[in-house]
């Protein structure tokens, strides 16, 4: 590069100074800032640069730069964006990860900045923008793909665009429709509901109606007829034909190339980090993604050339449009890059230190690039992490001879390094009756047989508690705060009490050094609070002392409390309590650093020098959430960026890595056999992250089941406890939360067989309801509220639909049910909902209807509704762990008539969902049933009898309104 000074583009002055998103649009080959009010709007004729700045827990800033290329943009503008991206990176210190984003093929990371989706707009700088406020509303049809990051694509508004494999959103002026292809993905259906809510709020002022249309269900819902009318009437839809844009690149084994003077040259041999030299650029071809690796001391012009070389490589190989190009800098490689290597030695696994950044800054400045704000670090203050509710029941067993032996109360908290322990903590949290935290603790000198026994017994205990406990495997020295806080005092002692430990010592020809109250022992106390109040027995020599801690020296009948010059008052108080715990009633001799007696040094074998340096804490890192898969037998993980609670899919297992702990979250709808592999999956991840990220093999590992998440897991999310209580698959959950209804999806793998007697009773009630209204007159005008035509034909169609729903073959044998509602329950629920609309419409159209006739209709419908609710409740109870767990609780019976007469009542204040003094031991789905008759009428404005005659959806709305849902 020439020696002339290169002036930083004014648009990039002061960038990356605070966390957030900054966007520029390329206009006349120059970057122009996009105001925040316009973030998320991308015009198809333009190219954009997006900078995402995040601040990690250590206080340093991290940068990701994306340049987005619209499908109608010019090649020159796209090239300008690529060059300006490199210049922006240089202004940030040359350490950003850069991504090329092609419209329609954006990375999940890019889309995660603009949840729930982006909707590319027509036009651009050159062709002129279309202002939405100047346009008349245009009906649009979209495909909605992606189970986490949503790819929304507008397609022609025509029947030929529909297929059986995708989810579609039809956005009309009056109503938004979701069309679920028969073979479409459950998670994509759920995400489409989120997009619909976004469209409704953003473009319809929150007032548009929403309708769900299921492929192949023409006759069961009135919305289906309305939907097909918009396409000119119903007709079969064609099979999906993949377009060129939908071709997904195939992942291939990684192949490394060097880049020199814009040319790529293949490098043979097994991939190794040592092959990457810091003064060169490389191309790593993974098939679906191309990585450019840039050495830390390469020049800016070399980096620009490398980007162009990668684009030329993709073009020459005729790769699909969806092929991603990502540029990474030495020392800041993301997991997706490092995972292509068998190992990634930790020498440079973490970002370069300040000295390294200074060298980069000097080099770039020499090249003429002005730098601002390379990094800003803030001091890290120790925060007390979330701990479990106090006042629970703590039980501890130690493992001995293939069985567990309970520890007496006065020994709880004394853990020996040669032994294994089971720790069960039972406590109350929120509305649930009981929560459980079950831990296996492995001493560093414990044997393999005892560890396996502990795991086996923990599994047995978990099964006896119906799968509800949060399970943890914890190794000595890696105890997390929530484990330490369980004990009033926790002291890790040398030796062991189990026969397994003693036998291993005998085999080694040693008697061991098991702690006893009479032995010489030195105990280090470094904790300052309940979350870190762990004490540790260390070698009884003077070199073990540290000026920042307190120590207890036990020698015969004497107990010294040694106080380091830099220790805290809290440590000193804790040390005194530990002394009383180990030797109750003993007299403590205080010894401040520098004033020790000769007897103190004699017990330690003589005075020696010791450290006065504070032990550095482990590196604090940001949490990362992963999904996983097996590709040709190889375990692979994929990061979920900018994650939130909604990314935890009930059909899957997920891995949360905080670097200090690893959690395996197991969804309710995961196959039971897969659930049993949770710890195996977690260990596979630890092995992988150990080789790539330097994760400790002894990191605490947890198994957490959906609905039983503890506070120390939910703290990493903006957690909404109401979401965790909704039953069903991803689609059913989202429908219940967003639409306030259970529009359930048929599960082809399960079918609910209810007896002929139940079906006959429901159909009899239905017939009674229709016969009572057969003499009514109805208006010929169309009822917009439900899209029905009225009259005998409407009733006949609804009756036929419900008959079909209830008359399933009784001879078919039902396979084991999965969690959530079964297919027949889904059909019946939809049919009953349709019936509700029919009856409501009939009453609205007949003002002269007698009160007695209306009462008959209400009674008949309530009988069907009650039968349906009882059926669904029974099915949920058979498949739901939460329902199994609550089976022991006192609760009203499922029959509404019996609920009304329950003898147990509580005040409205205590029954509310967010009560400060919540009731326990009740059925939380029927809070209202525990109100007295008087208070029920005060709250709801009606008698219980009238309330339970209402449709289920209306009951739920009222319960939500009064905080009883």
Swiss-Prot record:
The keyword Zinc-finger does not apply. Residues 769-828, 840-906 are annotated as: Disordered. Residues 900-965 form the HP domain. The modification Phosphoserine is found at residue 880. Gelsolin-like repeats lie at residues 27-79, 150-190, 262-304, 401-452, 533-573, 635-676. One of its GO terms (cellular component) is cytosol. SMART domains: GEL, VHP. The HP domain is important for the localization to actin filament bundles. This is Villin-3.
